[in-house]
Each structure stands twice: as structure tokens, then as C-alpha cells.
Amino acid sequence: MIHDAFEDFAAALPQMTALVGLDFGEKTIGVAVSDRIGAVATPLETIRRKKFTLDSNRLLEIIAGRDINGILLGLPRNMDGSEGPRCQSTRAFARNLSRVTDLPIGFWDERLSTVAAERALLEADTSRKRRAEVIDHVAASYILQGALDRMRHIRSS
């Protein structure tokens, strides 16, 4: 089930659960996973997009192998908060994904996540080639970590 409101997504999840975070792009899908207590997001891999069936099969393999209980997609809003074509693509991907899994699917505002990931990689003195290889799944971990932090705040209130 797709949850547009993050609070609804958080409420649909078990208390202690692992999540997968996705940075959905035109050519790639950055993938990050959380630990089972939902405290730390870790970059996992970048999927080179091909066809939806192949992409979703790889995601479902990751989900099955890591006991994931929720899917979080970064929503690439414009800087003014409006939704453009990239948001529409992300929402369409979520709708298609909801047809192949019963896991709750939520969204997290991903504005500037790639910028933050790029900055962190530059500070770590990562080569340009290596940055290009890992930027998407590092951005996915930034997206997922932001959501995990918010979820912890919601649950402690």
C-alpha cells in the first residue's frame, strides 16, 4: 500500500523493522538499507535501470534477503516544494511496485540529498570515478537516514 503522508507510512510499520530506501532516477536506482532497529541507513548498491520487471525483481531479491518491512522512495520535489515530472515518474514507479509487493511504500522529500552525498564523498577525498559509481546509493542512504530520524522523533512523541 502506498502512503502519501510520511506519518501514515510510519504508522503502518512494525516498531522494530528494517527498511529499504530508494533514490529513483532515470538511469539508476540507488539502494540503501536500514538496520533492524531502524537507527542507521547503509548504502547498498546502485541498480542500473533496464525494464521494470528486472528492476523490481532485483529489489524484491534485496528485500527478501534482508527481512525488509517497508519501502521508502525519495521524492524529488522542486526547490519550491512543487512536484514536477521526476516526482510523477517516482510515483508511477511506486504504483507499479505496489502491484508486486504488499509492503508499505512511503515517500521522503529528497531535495538536496544528492548534493549532500556528493559533498560527503568529496570530503572523504573520493575519486571522481568512484563518486560516479556510488553517488546514487549514498544519496539513497541520506534519504533513508532522514526518514529514520523523523520516524524516531514521531515514535518518541
UniProtKB/Swiss-Prot annotation:
<dbReference type="InterPro" id="IPR037027">
    <property type="entry name" value="YqgF/RNaseH-like_dom_sf"/>
</dbReference>
<comment type="similarity">
    <text>Belongs to the YqgF nuclease family.</text>
</comment>
<dbReference type="GO" id="GO:0000967">
    <property type="term" value="P:rRNA 5'-end processing"/>
</dbReference>
<keyword id="KW-0963">Cytoplasm</keyword>
<comment type="function">
    <text>Could be a nuclease involved in processing of the 5'-end of pre-16S rRNA.</text>
</comment>
<dbReference type="InterPro" id="IPR005227">
    <property type="entry name" value="YqgF"/>
</dbReference>
<keyword id="KW-0378">Hydrolase</keyword>
<protein>
    <recommendedName>
        <fullName>Putative pre-16S rRNA nuclease</fullName>
        <ecNumber>3.1.-.-</ecNumber>
    </recommendedName>
</protein>
<dbReference type="GO" id="GO:0004518">
    <property type="term" value="F:nuclease activity"/>
</dbReference>
<dbReference type="InterPro" id="IPR006641">
    <property type="entry name" value="YqgF/RNaseH-like_dom"/>
</dbReference>
<dbReference type="InterPro" id="IPR012337">
    <property type="entry name" value="RNaseH-like_sf"/>
</dbReference>
<dbReference type="Pfam" id="PF03652">
    <property type="entry name" value="RuvX"/>
</dbReference>
<dbReference type="GO" id="GO:0005829">
    <property type="term" value="C:cytosol"/>
</dbReference>
<keyword id="KW-0540">Nuclease</keyword>
<keyword id="KW-0690">Ribosome biogenesis</keyword>
